[in-house]
Amino acid sequence: MKPIIYIKYGELTLKGKNRAQFIKVLVHNIKQMLLEYHELVYQVGYDNLKIINLEKYNLQQVINDLQQVYGIAFICVAYQVNKEINEIQLACNKLVNNTDQTFKIEARRNDKSFIYDSMQIKQICATYLLQNQPTLKVDVHHPQLLINIEIKHDCAIVYGHKIPGAKGLPVGINGKALVLLSGGIDSPVASRLIMKRGISVDFITFITPPHTSQKALDKTIALAKQITLNNHLTKANLYVCNFTKLQEEIAHISKESYRITLMRRYFMRIAKRLAIDIKAGALVTGEALGQVASQTLNSMQTISSVLNDFLVLRPLITYDKQEIISLAKQFNTYELSILPYDDSCSLFAPKNPTTNPNVQTAMKLEQESLVLDAIYELVFTKEITKINLSSK
């Protein structure tokens, strides 16, 4: 009797007519995550996925990889047996690693034609365990081991501990967004949270050589790879925009306090145009309300006004910094994010950036330059490089 992996789907089971598409996307994502395990066999069910042929692989490593995939409610090590009560009993016995513990059995029949009802299945299997392992004890309220028996139409599944999945929705089921990715803590976390809601991502980052170094770009590439788990979670590209020419022109505006505001307005303009080109339906930022000068209500309104009606998603808008750091550590992006390489925002930030900008002043300052729009057009058409994260 060999173990299998038994996966229960997450939120996608609530989606009615779209169920088949949700399952298709989830199974595809699982296969992408487990691409290196060449001999695995997948059996797709209405509310579950079974993975068999695991003998050659490290079972715990497969489970660890599966825990990263959005759309999974829980994962179990299980036994798939014939619908014979003696085989079900043996499978229950396989799950008992410690004979000095309490247990409870739950049973469910999808196949109502099975000879025993749920209560009888529980009684027969519990009696078998107690006879074969006398030190076991039944505890129906707080058992140390909960054994689950599911009688399917074609087999019986027996499993114990439920390992939590990442939950959420399968990445890609809700379209694509373009993430404005910096080398900081926030935007990588925002990326993962938006992926959890079923959105695939591409990234855009802004560099200002020679003011920013190659190491700073390498850090951002490493972050993008970690966010996507080397493109196993989603097939993403990183677009690198050389912003130096625009940055140097913005540095000459008459109101230094507006420098970051104008810079971010051009970030948004460039990101929107790129998003439309790559068929992304929204932009994603790591903004958290009130965290820095450019993230007040007035600042965000002034900056995003250049987008007209184009959608901006801000998954971190209500989070405080410690919550974001905690998630960054969970996603293994934190240590990369705190590497000491400056990005374009930090290098060009004024001493006292405005926290209360307005659209009219921002537009007036942009109009001070006779060449700003021409430089913007040049940067968008000539200064964006695409990096395929699967190959670099």
From Swiss-Prot:
GO terms for biological process: thiamine biosynthetic process; thiamine diphosphate biosynthetic process; thiazole biosynthetic process; tRNA 4-thiouridine biosynthesis. Its main location: cytoplasm. Residues 60-162 form the THUMP domain. One of its GO terms (cellular component) is cytosol. Pathway: Cofactor biosynthesis; thiamine diphosphate biosynthesis. It is found in: Cytoplasm. It catalyses: [ThiI sulfur-carrier protein]-S-sulfanyl-L-cysteine + a uridine in tRNA + 2 reduced [2Fe-2S]-[ferredoxin] + ATP + H(+) = [ThiI sulfur-carrier protein]-L-cysteine + a 4-thiouridine in tRNA + 2 oxidized [2Fe-2S]-[ferredoxin] + AMP + diphosphate; [ThiS sulfur-carrier protein]-C-terminal Gly-Gly-AMP + S-sulfanyl-L-cysteinyl-[cysteine desulfurase] + AH2 = [ThiS sulfur-carrier protein]-C-terminal-Gly-aminoethanethioate + L-cysteinyl-[cysteine desulfurase] + A + AMP + 2 H(+). The keyword RNA-binding applies. Keywords: ATP-binding, Cytoplasm, Nucleotide-binding, RNA-binding, Thiamine biosynthesis, Transferase, tRNA-binding. CDD domains: PPase_ThiI, THUMP_ThiI. It is an enzyme of class 2 (transferase). One of its GO terms (molecular function) is tRNA binding. ATP binds at residues 180-181, 205-206, 264, 286, 295. Its EC number is 2.8.1.4. Catalyzes the ATP-dependent transfer of a sulfur to tRNA to produce 4-thiouridine in position 8 of tRNAs, which functions as a near-UV photosensor. Also catalyzes the transfer of sulfur to the sulfur carrier protein ThiS, forming ThiS-thiocarboxylate. This is a step in the synthesis of thiazole, in the thiamine biosynthesis pathway. The sulfur is donated as persulfide by IscS. NCBIfam families: tRNA uracil 4-sulfurtransferase ThiI. Belongs to the ThiI family. This is Probable tRNA sulfurtransferase. It comes from Ureaplasma urealyticum serovar 10 (strain ATCC 33699 / Western).
